[in-house]
Amino acid sequence: MKTIVCFLTILILVSSCESKNKKVVIIPGPKGERPDIKVVEGPSTVEDDFCYDCVRRCMVKGVGFYFRSCKGFVCRCYYPFMGGYGP
């Protein structure tokens, strides 16, 4: 019964946070105890969205462009040299 209640609680938290762009972080507890559940909202979700858009832009640039990195809101794509390997 405890497992079902715990599962339904996690399911409700995840579904309610999906519409608000929040993340649910589940931290495993010690053996035999329930895990901690934390709802995180902040710049990490904004940066994740930016990096997702970055990957899409690299793919749209043209055939052969690949995603390289996304750090500090800087999107980097690269075009591989002859031989198929990038820098």
UniProtKB/Swiss-Prot annotation:
Key words, A-Z: Antimicrobial, Disulfide bond, Fungicide, Plant defense, Secreted, Signal
GO CC, one annotated term: extracellular region
GO terms classed as biological process: defense response to fungus; killing of cells of another organism
Disulphides: C51-C70, C54-C75, C58-C77
Keyword Disulfide bond included in the entry's annotation: yes
Subcellular location: Secreted
Signal peptide positions (record): 1-19
Record family assignment: Belongs to the DEFL family.
Name of the protein: Defensin-like protein 218
Organism lineage string: Eukaryota, Viridiplantae, Streptophyta, Embryophyta, Tracheophyta
